[in-house]
Each structure stands twice: as C-alpha cells, then as structure tokens.
Amino acid sequence: MILEIITPEKEAFKGEVTSVKFPGTSGGFEILNNHAPIISTLTKGNIRIITTDNKTETLAINGGVIEMQDNKIIVLSD
C-alpha cells in the first residue's frame, strides 16, 4: 500500500509500506494492507512505518488527520 505524509512545510514521507502504526486520539492503531476505509484524528506521538523492504522509520507528529482508502493512506499532520 502507499503512504503519503504531508506537513505544512513538506512531504515528509511517500512510499510503499506493509504496515503503519498511528497515535490516534482514542488510542494507538495499526493499518495493514487491504484495511477497510477509515478516517481518524491523530494526537501528538510517533508514526511507526514498516516499509516493503522491512525497514522501520519513525516520524514524530503533533497531531493530524489520516484517511485510508483503496490501499492508499494520506496523513495531514503538524
């Protein structure tokens, strides 16, 4: 699936991933391939990304919104 993380300053990440963990406002959650469509708010914390070549990346955010549809995740964050 494709993950795109956009901040006011730049595109922080864009690429193929196998899983992503988010700091949701109601608690952390993980999105895997073929996840049901979802829109959720995010709180301050870390986004943990597992890429298709099994590398882990972590990005700190202050909050934001995530949308997942058709195996594409878009995150708008601070």
Put a short name on every predicted segment.
Residues 2-78:
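Compact, glycine-rich, soluble single-domain proteins
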